[in-house]
Amino acid sequence: MNNIWWQTKGQGNVHLVLLHGWGLNAEVWRCIDEELSSHFTLHLVDLPGFGRSRGFGAMSLADMAEAVLRQAPDKAIWLGWSLGGLVASQIALTHPERVQALVTVASSPCFSARDEWPGIKPDVLAGFQQQLSDDFQRTVERFLALQTMGTETARQDARALKKTVLALPMPEVDVLNGGLEILKTVDLRQPLQNVSMPFLRLYGYLDGLVPRKVVPMLDKLWPHSESYIFAKAAHAPFISHPAEFCRMLVALKQRV
């Protein structure tokens, strides 16, 4: 059985698990891990096949969630960014007793555009899959550039993301492809109507991957959840707005 790379920091009375996005690894949280570990017992995770969690191939969302859960604390706040938001949501659906609160960051229950649903055009995702086999480092870099576009700190935010990717060996092409397949095919809009734990959704107003149009649609579909939009953030609000981001999580902790 392959093990997932997992690091625990801090001694807070509430556990907080952070799940990163596609192509990245847990180093992406270094801008906020000191602050958060002073309030929580913080768990930094490399998703299977990413970063230091080697030896995994492409996985379905359900298998990825189960693999992560095997090493997780009994009960925690689960926070997932982008693709990680789908993994955290899947865990909330299948093991609600282990999720004190669900937080999704710049994530969509359905990343792919559908009828009357804004998202990434399926041919864009298919194009990324095609380009992965040609030049996967450049493809990952293009995807990262999309994530910070439009913010005041776009250049330096993109550099921070690139540094995270380059700090560790690149994931295998089939793992990257499998992640894109999840983004292309998964739709959790209806299932997430049934979660009952506190559910906080955080967005960036300038996000080019998760259009802000989905926010009111999901407010209506999931009236039990709360949403907040960072006015000047794109796809990585914790990098562009770290202090504000951490404050929201500390406030959530008081409520669980």
Curated annotation (Swiss-Prot):
It is an enzyme of class 3 (hydrolase). GO terms for biological process: biotin biosynthetic process. Substrate binds at residues 22, 82-83, 143-147, 235. Residues 15-242 form the AB hydrolase-1 domain. The keyword Cytoplasm applies. It comes from the Bacteria. The active site is at 82 (nucleophile), 207, 235. Monomer. Belongs to the AB hydrolase superfamily. Carboxylesterase BioH family. This is Pimeloyl-[acyl-carrier protein] methyl ester esterase. It comes from Escherichia coli (strain SMS-3-5 / SECEC).
